[in-house]
Amino acid sequence: MNKKKCMILALAVLPMLNSCSDWLDPKPLSFYSPENTYVDAAGLYAALTACERNMRHEFFGDGAPILTEMYLTDIAVHGKTDESGSLVDLDNEMLPSRTKNDMKGKNKWYWEEGFKGIKYANIAISRLDGAEYKDEAERNAVLGAAYFQRAYRYYKLTHQFGDVPYLDKEITEPKLDFYSYDRWSILEQCKKDLEFAYQWVPEVQPRGRANKDACGVLLMKICMAVGDFDRAIAVGKEVVGRHPLMTGRFTGNQTKPNTNLMHDLHSVEAKIDMSNTEGIMYVVAHPTTTPLDKDNRIYTMRNALPYWAKGGAIKTPDGKTGTAIAPDEADKNTEIDNDTKYGRGIGTCRPTNYYQYEIWGEKEKNDLRGPFNHDSWRRMEDLRYNDPGLKKTNNPYYGQNLIRPVDLSVADSIRCWYMWPHYKVFVPDPTKTQDLQGGETPWYVYRSAEVYLMMAECYYWKGDATNEAAMLNVVRARAGAEPLSGNIGIAEVLAERARELYYEENRHVELVRISYLYAKTGKPCEALGLSLIHISEPTRH
């Protein structure tokens, strides 16, 4: 009887054993698996959306990565000198063993997020031929957009880290044998890819996605990096032909007092205004398109403004605590409410004397972008003594403008007392009533103003000072600065970039690119009186 039962059980199990392989064959549980997603242009653009999101994160948030690109140049320093391990002591903190991806610095962020962007772009590139398209133009537009995203990362990585691994396809299995490639070869490949992208990516794309002229701007940068200045100029002329500068007041801000064209150009309204011809490429955060969280707030006021609310740092002339985030309740949203009028900063990104003073001379007296214009820039003396304790004690300084202390300490002058470009960094946050630090907004990645400055630099390398000045003067004229003429060089290009592109450009990347070009071309640097002969041989000093 037991034998019979065993035979029956065995016969019952046999079919199950035969179907075992079917049980173990994994089936995707999600409609969004790669096999179900990357089947058409829309699916592949979804992969590139991850690239666009990471582009936004470079500019947004407390201690945004773009600040590290500013600390490592002539326009800003890390203001938190009281925080150990921050990017203040560069000799020790920029070593390979001291990589950072926190509030103290973000050099590691560029490495990690750079290769993440390359990974997402390579997914679209590798899966391109497995999808269906309505025509060749749609296919090539997707490929061009992916090429843009990959080149966007490699342009930065090759100038931040030099020779790096080059990945040109999706990695689908564990891989440990990565090797660095020559940076020049990587840039040449990116140039080839971007020529394709510039041909095929449409001129009109949804805001936040790379369009034809965004591809053109990046192509210009890479042409400049490899020394092809004529091609960069040719592309630049085409781009500015399609994207003229905004030279007249626009947006609803034009009716507000104490504003000018620069306030219009850098307002939230301007960056969502489809008639804004100057904007070429944006990263996008807006309550209608992105979740409301700290990663989607720009935090420009927190990062760039002085730490005016630091306890005890700002005192009245009679020695009392002078400022507070919130004034007396009766004085909220008035002239003495520094928080709502200017924003609450913590002095993370402190502008240098070069950016505050040295680049603003007699020719910039009427420049709308500079500190001579008191609507565009703010000083600590514009703020008010507003600590509620002053009002309670009937202190006569309550509500008065700040007075520079005669005994201002070095520490306080670094983090708590300096000028700043209010027009550029003031971003309202309608979701908050206090502690305003910079809300949601689109942000410029590329503008045609930069294209003119890039063409000016190309003419510098070609030794054509006349056209160099002409390109710079297009941007200067719009801002109200006097024209440049005569013997100008790289210093004028870099000063104009600082005036125009604060908190927009990857200035460290651009300075490294220029350094490589001096080495590649052998052209003497007139700004420092240096040439290749000073550095090319170990015996020379």
Spell out what each predicted region is.
Residues 20-68:
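Membrane-proximal, proline-rich intrinsically disordered regions
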Residues 39-59, 81-160, 177-184, 194-207, ...:
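Conserved, well-structured interaction surfaces
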Residues 59, 83-109, 250-448, 525-536:
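Elongated scaffold/linker segments in the mid-to-C-terminal portions of large proteins
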Residues 62-82, 203-218, 225-311, 481-494, ...:
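Short, surface-exposed recognition loops and adjoining beta-strand edges that mediate ligand/DNA contacts
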